Design a protein with these regions (language model features):
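Non-catalytic architectural context of zinc metalloproteases
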Residues: 1-67
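Auxiliary, metal-adjacent structural segments of Zn-dependent hydrolase domains
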Residues: 53-110, 125-126
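Hydrophobic (often cysteine-bearing) scaffold residues that line and stabilize catalytic clefts
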Residues: 70, 129, 162, 166, ...
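A short mid-domain helix/strand-loop element embedded in enzyme catalytic domains
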Residues: 89, 95-115, 136-152
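Pan-zinc metallopeptidase signature
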Residues: 202-281
Length: 281
């Protein structure tokens, strides 16, 4: 089911000069989206939202394209998962316009709702296909774990090794669903990721070492932001380098143990040990 709230944002945008009060009216009419969004994915401050209002005009044409194309892309990618993996699960997608925080995310549930923030997305159809395939990849992965007897009571969702592994699997599977694009698109969801990818390739050893150091010293929300959020990038000048590490780890598992082990590694092996051993190589 697709809950597309972008048209109600556009209606407000076109009918009035959007001020904070008007924007907040949109946010409060969709608590199913914005409670989660402002809790974990975007600061809910007047300054942040006033800046967003200034940034919307440059993005409004893209948002108009995305409100029409994204629901079609979601259906198309859902069908691709069905055709490739015989994957049929009822999923819920929320499309919205936010405050320039996260671009897309999934609730931390086995079959969590998926959220897509139009102002942070590229309107290019292939870019949309990849980010949708990535988010559905998280759900597919969870269902595979569930089918293999995963004990969710023991799942440490916020652990660094878990984050690294889960983002790696979602990226890995998105490459199988949307084939033939430039490698960097699977990480950046736009055409601007080439230098970012090259930086990772040239500095992988150093990046692995730094992640391992952060992990050993104790994981914090600041470190999660540094490695896995758009707001990171203090260490090396590039954010979300954890996605590259995760995909490299998953490709290593696929090579060493076979592809079927990729999706169930978390409940069959000691994930922390596996990740730490790989980071130390």
């Amino acid at each position: 089911m697709i809950n597309n709230t972008i048209p109600s944002f556009l209606k407000l945008w076109e009918s009035t000069d959007v001020e904070l009060a008007v924007l907040n009216q949109y946010f409060t009419s969709h608590p199913e989206i914005f409670e989660e969004y402002f809790k974990y994915h975007c600061p809910n401050t007047n300054e942040r939202l006033s800046n967003a209002i200034k940034q919307y005009p440059a993005k409004i044409e893209d948002i108009r394209i995305i409100t029409k194309t994204l629901p079609i892309i979601i259906q198309e990618v859902t069908n691709a998962y069905h055709n490739k993996f015989n994957f049929d699960v009822k999923m819920k997608f929320h499309l919205f316009v936010g405050g320039f925080g996260s671009n897309a995310f999934v609730e931390r549930e086995i079959i969590g709702d998926m959220f897509f923030a139009a102002e942070k997305l590229s309107p290019n159809l292939n870019h949309l296909r990849v980010i949708v395939a990535h988010e559905i990849g998280h759900i597919y992965h969870n269902v595979m774990l569930q089918n293999n007897g995963m004990d969710w009571e023991k799942a440490e969702w916020t652990d660094a090794a878990v984050n690294l592994y889960r983002e790696g699997v979602a990226t890995y599977v998105s490459k199988q669903i949307v084939k033939g694009l430039n490698e960097s698109v699977y990480y950046s969801y736009d055409d601007d990721g080439e230098r970012w990818l090259q930086y990772y390739i040239e500095n992988e050893k150093q990046i692995k070492k730094r992640f391992l150091k952060d992990y050993i010293e104790g994981w914090t929300f600041e470190k999660e932001k540094e490695w896995f959020r758009l707001s990171g990038g203090q260490y090396f000048g590039y954010n979300r380098l954890g996605y590259f590490l995760g995909t490299a780890f998953v490709e290593y598992v696929a090579q060493a143990l076979g592809e079927s082990e990729v999706f169930t590694f978390w409940n069959k092996h000691n994930l922390k040990r596996g990740v730490m051993d790989w980071l130390s190589k």
